[in-house]
Structures are given as C-alpha cells and as structure tokens.
C-alpha cells in the first residue's frame, strides 16, 4: 500500500505508493477513517486518470489494504488480453461439455434434460451461493473455514497441511492479479473472497449457458403473420439488449466488489454516485436486469422458456430478500424503527381485509344471503343489515386508504438534491395518477349513486334488469379494473419505497381477483345477456387497429377463454379425485398401523469410541452472584405441616446454590489433555433431561465452546475466558495426572430468563455425550418484603424499591453500559426501545418480586429506574384495598 506498511497515523507519505503491504490498525473505526481518507486522496490525485487510481479497503479486524483491480467474469474467461489460469480452463471445459451435450442429445431429450441442468445450476446460484453468503454474513463462516484449514498460511510455518494447494492457489490468484497484489501479504478475508468468486464464476456462467441451450432446445416456429413475427422478434431483441445494458451499466457503477458480494468479506469506504440504471428501478440487477429472459422467451416463442424464466426470476427475488437484503440492512442500515414495521403490517392487513374479507362476505351474500340471514336470525331487518354493511364497507375502505397513506408518509423522504430530474418527473406523474383516481371515484359515485357504490345489488333486487351505461361507464365497462388504483400506484411512484410498491402490487392483484371471482359472477347472474361486451374506448381502439391485429386479438381472447374453462374443469376434477385419494390414504394408513404397531426408535447421537477418556478427569465448578441467606427463609411460608416448619438440619457442609436472576455465571472446567477441541458446555433445566449420560434436548443457543475457532460460528466463542491452561498433577496424589483447565462465562442470551433449577453439562467432541455435570443450582427472584425495609422521609418505600430494582434491571440489560443504567436517574439505552426482550425480562422480574404485572411498553415508556419504581409504588397503593398484607407508610389517602 501507500506504503501501508510505512503509513503514519496522520496519513502522511500517502503519495509515495511503494508497496501493497497491509496496515493493521487498532480497531474498525480507525480503519474506516483511514480508508475514507485514502480513497478521497486518490480521487483528488487521479481525478482525470482512472487507470492510476487505487482503491483501499478494510477488513472487520481493522486491516487496511489495497483492493487490486480485477475484471468481470466474461473478460477473464474469453478476452485474449486477459491472463488465463487453470481455473479458467476448468470453467471453459464445463461450458464446452454443456454445449457438446446439447449437440449429442436427440432433439426429444434436449428440453427435459436441459431444464433439469438449468434448474440445478440455478439452485446452485440461489440456494448454494445463498447458503454460503448467509453463513458468511451471520457467522463469518467462509473466513473461519479458511482460517481453520490454514490453506493461506505459508508452508514454512508447518501449519499448512497442503503445501501443494497453497502453491496452486498462489499461482492461480497472482496470475489473475499481476498488480498491487501479493498472495502471502493479502488479508485472509480478501484471499477467501478471491477463491469464492471463482466458484461464483463457474456457477453463473453455467447458469446462463444452460439457460440459453434450454431456450434453443425449445425454439418454436408458430404459424403467424409477418407483422406478429416482426413484433415478437423486435420486442425480444430490445428486451435482450436492454438486459445487456442494465448488467453492463450496473457493473460500471458497483464494480467487482459488489458484483461478487465483496461486502460480505471486507468493506470499501468511499463516495459513490449511483447513477444510470440505479436511478431507473430498485435493485436493477434483479428486477429489470432479468428482462432479457422474457425477451429470449419471446424470440423462442415458447411458453416453456417463459415458465422457467419466471421460476428463475422468482428464485432470484427470494435470494435478494432472504440473503442480500438482510445483509444490507445489517451492514448499512440502522435497526428499522418499530413504527415502520407496524405501519407496513397495518396497511397490508387492512388491504387484505378490504378485498379478501369483504369479498368473502359479498360472495356468501350473493350465493346464500348469509349477511342478511345473520341479522334476520337475531330479530333485525334486511334494512338494518344493509345499514350495517354500509358502515363496515365505508370503515374498511377508509382504513385501507388511510393506512396506505400513513405507510407512504412514513416511508417517504425527499432526496438530498431536491425535486430535480427524474425525481421531479416521479412526483408530477404520481400526483397526476392520484388526481386520476380521485376523479374516477367521483365519477363512479355520480353514475352509480349510494346503492351502486355500496354494492346494493348484493342485498336487494336491482330496480332494472339492464345496466345503464352513463357517466364514466359510457367509456369503460369497469373503470375500477383500469383506473381504480391509479392513485395507489401514484403514491408508490412518489415514495419509491419497496414496501409501498409491495403493498400496491398486492392491492392491485387482490382487486383484480375481487372483480374476477366476486363481482363478475354476481353481475352475470343478475343481468345475464344484457351486459355490454365491449366498452366505448375498446370499440374505438379496435376499429383503429389493422385487420390482422383484430383477428389476432379475437383468436387470443378465444384461446384464453378456452384455457380458463379447461383449467377450471381440470381443477374441479382434481379436487374430487384428490379428496377421494386422501380418504383412501388415511384409511390404508390407519389399518397399516393397526396391523403393525411397531415402535420405531429414533436416536439423535451416533455411537462413538470414548475409550481413552477418563470421566473422573472431567469437572465443572460454578461461580455466580449468590442471593443473601435471608432468601432461603422465603421457602417456609407457614404452608407446611408442623414438622416441616423448622429449617432442615444438614449432616454435611453442602449448601444450596441460589443465584441472581440474569447475573452472569462463570463455569470453570477441567478435562484430560487428550480431550476434544470441539467440546462444549451447555446450560439446561434439570427437569429437561432424563438421562445423565446423553443430552436429548437442544440448548437453543445456551452453550459455549471450550476452545476458540473450533466451530463454524462466532457465537460459539462468545463467553470463552480461558482455554486449555495446563494444570500440573498433584505430587501428593498418586492418581492425579496433568490436565487442562479453562473458564467460560454465560451471559445475556446464553442464560435462561426464568426461574427454576438448572445445571451445566460438559459435552464431548461436538456431540451430546455428557462427560461431566455441574452442581444443580437455582435461579430465584426474591419477593420484596415491605415489612423488612425502612420508609423514607415522606413515609414511603419509594427509595427501597429503587435500590432493590436497580441491580435487577442492570442484570436484565446484560450489564451493558450502553443500555444499563448505573443510577436510578440515568435513562435506559435506546436499544431497550428497539428490542422488546429487555423490557419483557424486567416485566417478568417485577411480577415475581412485587406481584404486579405490567406490559413491556410500560418499561420502555418510563425510561428510568426511578420512574418505574414510582409506578410500582403507585400500583401498590391502588391495589392496597385488595391486599390483606400489612404495609408501611401511607398507602391510602387520609381524611382530614
């Protein structure tokens, strides 16, 4: 780097640029500031010459390094100017084998085989790469694999078990990156990313080539006019070229770093301008970037290609939602406010109710008059049913629109550059669409009146058996289908938020379903042949079209109607057949189990050779914050028999271990020298395990490894304090031998946040064989005894409640100084409001200690220990008339 090995803290000597040796800084924040400074300096020094500009990145541990220039996969594989290596030859060989397979197969076998091949590579892309990236994002799994395998360490150190693989990787990667890169000096994260992207190259190239070969196998020449042929090919080519431009422009903006998901491994801090295709649509590489698939389907004139394109596109969106978006939110976005989530769920729920809920009521009313029957059953009239329906419909419609506007208002943010360019166009277009929907709604109400607006013909017989086509209905048969949701889309275009677009899309689909499956059958039943087949606008447009297009439209309409009727008939047949098959299956299965009542044993562990391990050398000791001895007296409350009311007499020095609720617990372990590095310690309720030798219930995350880096998860190492510390044998004990000791701490989410009796279990080799058990201990929340505290100067117990409450709340907040208060006046940290688990812990403790149950929102609203203590005292005053226990102080108002 610049020489990053010789860089000073103030950033001097940045212009010397001798080597690419990384710089190791103290923490991630310092590294971020250094990278920003370096990249800004490079932008200034080489503003007019991009070829000489270097890019700097950083790893999570604070290592700053030069990110060498790399090239896209197509250039690497096919460009003669780019150096080639063994992995390039392997990828090209796989691609060549796909092409040879295509030509070797008979035409009848190409379609099914290449459909399977493409779906395999698509699964490798979305499921395979998605799984790897998800593990890397959550647990740093790929980097941990590389670290544990030592494949990037020099063979001279003796740690690398595969020197030949090291030399191969060094030759492969340095061949590809001749400038600013040394294999042995590059950070572990960057080398891991380089190997990962070679796997990505193979999967992505095979995915695209197998799709193209499948499309060629499905090529079809339909009988059509020259006009349709030209229209189909022109549209397909335009979509394909548009797809190509989207990919190239996206790569121009994000470079290889984002193209190959580099931010899952390391980060580049610099100022980027997201122009071009990124101003056109959200996530352009996954949305409009798949237009070429549909263009190819058009050119091939194949519904099979269209179907598999839709499947691939849907899988890509699933990859975006489940993997990439979660990582982006985790890395770049602060935790989303709970209000936004609530507003989204609220708008979505109201839209579902408005279409599905009201649609179901209207469907039952149309077929069985269920709504009217319900009111008549309880003594009301059909007029009352009609009035109640109008109220419900109006409320549902108002809340549906209001909740959507509230969501859009919360999601909307004015761009930093103001209303200019495309942003201004979006606002003008959106405002126009909103005005269009308002005008449409007013026109519909003027034409239909109150009776038609509230679907009156579902409840009363219409005054006429023929529809009157006036107002807006003179031009459109069903304006709600075409213009009814224009304003919803206008708001979505203005906000430009994925959440608002999702609700708008859902609303449109549900509206079309309502019109097709609820309103249309009812209108046909009422008015039958008196319906107008074609609206005024449709008739005018149809007359302006050429004859071939009109003929094609008629044929297409007939084909679609025939297809819909066939599908409905097929579903009816399948429904009856499926119901009969299910009955047969249930009867056969029942008789089979009656005939063969065998028990199938299920075991969750495999037999394993534990010879050579001495169980006597495994030990566990517990150290935690114990409760005062006075708490033990709360066990005896006068509820026992006469003999059991006195404290039990012990015959040894054993003491019951009773620990504080939520306090960290340290566990010291001892194991033989040959113990497995994948040993682990779990925390369980004593009553959850019947066996003392094998654990048969999951720990739900309440476990810590004995040795660091033994598992593919950073969570496993959280809590390790000491590992494999040699404990020499006791010379005075002949049976004593050398052994290892260590210490781990259970805190936060690794604790049980309830009361009960628990134990720690030491497990062998990453499995569930129990090698040692700790002493059973109890987690208890002592009752607050008002008779045993002193009142303050005001005659209240407020101060005593504060003092009792403060340590409990500190434990509930994981004793984290960022959120846990150090005094009763200090406010809670902001994380308490964002994550409800902290408030729920406090609510449970308060209920156990004071006998008062609060909602978690009360804890978040109070914000300090003092306020919460005041609320507890006030609640005890209010509930005092219902309590028979004696109290100190003035708990009820005095008359005087």
UniProtKB/Swiss-Prot annotation:
<comment type="function">
    <text>Catalyzes the first step of the methylation pathway of phosphatidylcholine biosynthesis, the SAM-dependent methylation of phosphatidylethanolamine (PE) to phosphatidylmonomethylethanolamine (PMME).</text>
</comment>
<dbReference type="GO" id="GO:0032259">
    <property type="term" value="P:methylation"/>
</dbReference>
<dbReference type="GO" id="GO:0006656">
    <property type="term" value="P:phosphatidylcholine biosynthetic process"/>
</dbReference>
<feature type="transmembrane region" description="Helical">
    <location>
        <begin position="86"/>
        <end position="106"/>
    </location>
</feature>
<keyword id="KW-0812">Transmembrane</keyword>
<feature type="transmembrane region" description="Helical">
    <location>
        <begin position="305"/>
        <end position="325"/>
    </location>
</feature>
<keyword id="KW-0489">Methyltransferase</keyword>
<keyword id="KW-0808">Transferase</keyword>
<feature type="transmembrane region" description="Helical">
    <location>
        <begin position="428"/>
        <end position="448"/>
    </location>
</feature>
<keyword id="KW-1133">Transmembrane helix</keyword>
<feature type="transmembrane region" description="Helical">
    <location>
        <begin position="257"/>
        <end position="277"/>
    </location>
</feature>
<feature type="compositionally biased region" description="Basic and acidic residues">
    <location>
        <begin position="27"/>
        <end position="53"/>
    </location>
</feature>
<dbReference type="GO" id="GO:0004608">
    <property type="term" value="F:phosphatidylethanolamine N-methyltransferase activity"/>
</dbReference>
<dbReference type="GO" id="GO:0097038">
    <property type="term" value="C:perinuclear endoplasmic reticulum"/>
</dbReference>
<feature type="topological domain" description="Cytoplasmic">
    <location>
        <begin position="425"/>
        <end position="427"/>
    </location>
</feature>
<dbReference type="GO" id="GO:0032541">
    <property type="term" value="C:cortical endoplasmic reticulum"/>
</dbReference>
<keyword id="KW-0443">Lipid metabolism</keyword>
<feature type="topological domain" description="Cytoplasmic">
    <location>
        <begin position="503"/>
        <end position="896"/>
    </location>
</feature>
<feature type="topological domain" description="Cytoplasmic">
    <location>
        <begin position="220"/>
        <end position="225"/>
    </location>
</feature>
<feature type="transmembrane region" description="Helical">
    <location>
        <begin position="280"/>
        <end position="300"/>
    </location>
</feature>
<feature type="topological domain" description="Cytoplasmic">
    <location>
        <begin position="107"/>
        <end position="112"/>
    </location>
</feature>
<feature type="transmembrane region" description="Helical">
    <location>
        <begin position="482"/>
        <end position="502"/>
    </location>
</feature>
<keyword id="KW-0472">Membrane</keyword>
<dbReference type="InterPro" id="IPR007318">
    <property type="entry name" value="Phopholipid_MeTrfase"/>
</dbReference>
<protein>
    <recommendedName>
        <fullName>Phosphatidylethanolamine N-methyltransferase</fullName>
        <ecNumber>2.1.1.17</ecNumber>
    </recommendedName>
</protein>
<feature type="region of interest" description="Disordered">
    <location>
        <begin position="1"/>
        <end position="61"/>
    </location>
</feature>
<feature type="topological domain" description="Lumenal">
    <location>
        <begin position="247"/>
        <end position="256"/>
    </location>
</feature>
<dbReference type="Pfam" id="PF04191">
    <property type="entry name" value="PEMT"/>
</dbReference>
<comment type="pathway">
    <text>Phospholipid metabolism; phosphatidylcholine biosynthesis.</text>
</comment>
<feature type="transmembrane region" description="Helical">
    <location>
        <begin position="226"/>
        <end position="246"/>
    </location>
</feature>
<feature type="compositionally biased region" description="Basic and acidic residues">
    <location>
        <begin position="1"/>
        <end position="19"/>
    </location>
</feature>
<keyword id="KW-0256">Endoplasmic reticulum</keyword>
<feature type="transmembrane region" description="Helical">
    <location>
        <begin position="404"/>
        <end position="424"/>
    </location>
</feature>
<feature type="topological domain" description="Cytoplasmic">
    <location>
        <begin position="326"/>
        <end position="341"/>
    </location>
</feature>
<keyword id="KW-0594">Phospholipid biosynthesis</keyword>
<keyword id="KW-0949">S-adenosyl-L-methionine</keyword>
<feature type="topological domain" description="Lumenal">
    <location>
        <begin position="1"/>
        <end position="85"/>
    </location>
</feature>
<feature type="topological domain" description="Lumenal">
    <location>
        <begin position="449"/>
        <end position="481"/>
    </location>
</feature>
<dbReference type="GO" id="GO:0005789">
    <property type="term" value="C:endoplasmic reticulum membrane"/>
</dbReference>
<feature type="topological domain" description="Cytoplasmic">
    <location>
        <begin position="278"/>
        <end position="279"/>
    </location>
</feature>
<feature type="topological domain" description="Lumenal">
    <location>
        <begin position="134"/>
        <end position="198"/>
    </location>
</feature>
<feature type="topological domain" description="Lumenal">
    <location>
        <begin position="363"/>
        <end position="403"/>
    </location>
</feature>
């Amino acid at each position: 780097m610049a020489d990053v090995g010789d860089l000073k803290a103030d950033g001097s000597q940045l212009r010397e640029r001798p080597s690419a040796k990384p710089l190791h800084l103290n923490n991630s924040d310092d590294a971020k500031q250094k990278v920003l400074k370096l990249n800004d300096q490079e932008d200034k020094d080489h503003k007019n010459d991009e070829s000489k500009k270097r890019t700097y990145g950083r790893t999570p541990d604070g290592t700053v390094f030069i990110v060498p220039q790399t090239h896209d996969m197509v250039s690497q594989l096919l460009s003669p100017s780019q150096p080639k290596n063994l992995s390039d030859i392997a990828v090209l060989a796989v691609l060549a084998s796909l092409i040879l397979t295509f030509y070797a197969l008979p035409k009848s076998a190409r379609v099914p085989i290449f459909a399977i091949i493409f779906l395999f590579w698509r699964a490798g892309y979305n499921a395979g790469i998605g799984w790897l990236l998800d593990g890397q994002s959550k647990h740093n799994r790929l980097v941990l694999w590389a670290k544990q395998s030592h494949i990037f360490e020099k063979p001279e150190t003796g740690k690398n078990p595969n020197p030949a693989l090291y030399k191969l990787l060094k030759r492969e990667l340095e061949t590809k990156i001749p400038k600013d890169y040394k294999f042995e000096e590059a950070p572990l994260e960057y080398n891991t990313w380089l190997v990962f992207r070679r796997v990505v190259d193979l999967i992505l190239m095979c995915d695209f080539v197998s799709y193209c070969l499948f499309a060629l196998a499905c090529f079809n020449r339909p009988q059509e006019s020259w006009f349709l042929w030209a229209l189909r090919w022109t549209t397909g080519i335009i979509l394909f070229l548009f797809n190509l431009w989207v990919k190239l422009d996206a790569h121009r903006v994000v470079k290889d770093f984002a193209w190959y998901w580099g931010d899952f491994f390391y980060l580049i801090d610099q100022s980027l301008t997201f122009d071009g295709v990124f101003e056109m649509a959200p996530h352009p590489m996954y949305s409009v970037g798949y237009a070429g698939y549909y263009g190819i389907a058009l050119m091939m004139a194949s519904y099979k290609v269209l179907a598999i394109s839709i499947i691939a596109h849907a899988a890509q969106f699933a990859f975006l939602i489940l993997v990439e978006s979660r990582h982006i939110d985790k890395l770049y976005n602060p935790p989303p406010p709970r209000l936004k989530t609530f507003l989204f769920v609220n708008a979505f729920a109201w839209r579902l109710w408005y279409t599905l809920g009201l649609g179901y009521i209207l469907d039952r009313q149309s077929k069985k008059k269920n709504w009217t029957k319900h009111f008549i059953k309880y003594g009301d009239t059909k007029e009352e049913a009609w009035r109640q329906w109008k109220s419900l419909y109006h409320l549902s419609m108002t809340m549906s629109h209001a909740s959507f506007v509230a969501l859009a208002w919360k999601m909307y943010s004015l761009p930093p550059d103001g209303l200019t360019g495309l942003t201004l166009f979006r606002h003008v277009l959106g405002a126009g669409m909103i005005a269009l929907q308002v005008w449409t709604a007013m026109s519909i109400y003027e034409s239909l009146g109150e009776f038609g607006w509230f679907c009156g013909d579902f409840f009363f017989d219409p005054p006429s058996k023929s529809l009157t086509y006036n107002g807006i209905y003179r031009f459109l048969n069903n304006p709600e289908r075409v213009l009814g949701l224009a304003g919803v889309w206008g708001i979505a275009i203005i906000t430009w938020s994925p959440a608002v677009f999702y609700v708008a899309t859902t609303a449109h689909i549900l509206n079309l379903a309502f019109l097709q499956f609820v309103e249309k059958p009812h209108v046909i039943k009422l008015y039958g042949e008196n319906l107008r087949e074609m609206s005024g606008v449709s008739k005018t447009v149809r007359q302006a079209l050429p004859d071939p297009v009109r003929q094609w439209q008629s044929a297409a309409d007939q084909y679609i109607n025939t297809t819909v009727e066939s599908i409905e008939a097929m579903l009816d047949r399948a429904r009856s057949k499926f119901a009969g098959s299910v009955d047969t299956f249930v009867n056969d299965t029942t008789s089979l189990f009656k005939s063969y009542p065998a028990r199938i044993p299920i075991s969750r562990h495999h037999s394993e050779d534990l010879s050579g391990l001495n169980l006597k050398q495994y030990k566990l000791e517990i150290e935690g914050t114990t409760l005062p001895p006075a708490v033990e007296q709360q066990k005896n409350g006068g509820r026992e028999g006469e003999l059991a009311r006195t404290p039990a007499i012990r015959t040894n020095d054993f003491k019951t271990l009773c620990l504080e609720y939520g306090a960290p617990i340290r566990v010291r372990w001892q194991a033989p020298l040959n113990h497995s590095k994948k040993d682990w310690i779990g925390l369980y309720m004593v009553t959850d395990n019947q066996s003392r030798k094998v654990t048969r219930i999951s720990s739900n995350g309440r476990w810590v490894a004995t040795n660091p880096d033994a598992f593919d998860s950073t969570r496993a190492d959280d809590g390790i304090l000491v590992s494999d510390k040699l404990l020499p044998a006791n010379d005075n004990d002949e049976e004593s031998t050398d052994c290892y000791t260590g210490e781990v701490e259970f805190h936060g989410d690794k604790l049980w946040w309830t009361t009960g009796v628990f134990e720690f279990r030491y497990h062998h080799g990453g499995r569930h064989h129990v090698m040692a058990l700790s002493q059973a201990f109890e987690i208890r929340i002592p009752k607050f005894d008002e008779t045993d505290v002193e009142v303050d100067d005001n005659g209240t117990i407020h101060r005593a409640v504060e003092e009792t409450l403060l340590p409990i709340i500190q434990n509930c907040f994981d004793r984290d100084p960022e959120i846990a208060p150090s005094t009763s006046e200090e406010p809670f940290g902001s994380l308490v409001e964002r994550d409800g688990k902290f408030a729920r812990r406090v609510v449970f403790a308060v209920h156990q200690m004071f006998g008062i149950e609060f909602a978690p929102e009360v804890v978040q609203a109070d914000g300090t220990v003092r306020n919460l203590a005041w609320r507890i005292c006030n609640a005890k005053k209010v509930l005092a008339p219902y309590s028979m226990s004696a109290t100190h102080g003035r708990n009820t108002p005095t008359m005087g």
